[in-house]
């Protein structure tokens, strides 16, 4: 190409968290299949159905939280299967794509929860309001066990 304003780069550069984190106030937005009460993210598999690889999610999550003034958002609908399944889960049904220690902000149509730097108990308190109201009570009962352990 001949346009000097365009630079073609490999994903080894464009997905490099160290490169991206140099951008000030970078906000990254990724999706998920489900998020557990402590902020662990599954973006790969639903039950036995493998839906795809990580697609650079971990790189962009880490870049967002390392960027000066930046954030990393994981956005997902609160339910699946026409409202029959909560995507805010007690336990993930698939692998952990993004670890809880990398979770920054989780967003559903019911709000946003800032998780970075929070205890496991506080994370559960912040995650439950993100679930559809039909699922909050069973999630709260499960979260009570996490809180009871004192984490």
What is the role of each PLM region?
Residues 1-151:
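Conserved phosphate- and dinucleotide-binding cores of soluble alpha/beta proteins
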């Amino acid at each position: 190409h001949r346009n000097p304003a365009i630079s073609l780069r490999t994903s080894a550069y464009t997905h490099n968290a160290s490169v991206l984190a140099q951008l000030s106030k970078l906000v990254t937005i990724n999706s998920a299949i489900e998020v557990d009460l402590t902020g662990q993210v599954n973006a790969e598999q639903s039950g036995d159905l493998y839906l795809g690889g990580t697609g650079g999610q971990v790189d962009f999550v880490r870049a967002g939280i390392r960027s000066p003034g930046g954030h990393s958002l994981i956005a997902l609908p609160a339910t699946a299967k026409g409202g029959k399944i909560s995507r805010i889960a007690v336990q993930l049904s698939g692998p952990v794509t993004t670890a809880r220690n990398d979770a920054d902000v989780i967003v559903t149509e019911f709000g946003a929860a800032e998780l970075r730097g929070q205890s496991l108990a506080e994370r559960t308190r912040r995650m439950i309001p993100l679930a559809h109201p039909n699922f909050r009570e069973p999630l709260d009962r499960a979260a009570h066990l996490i809180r009871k352990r004192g984490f």
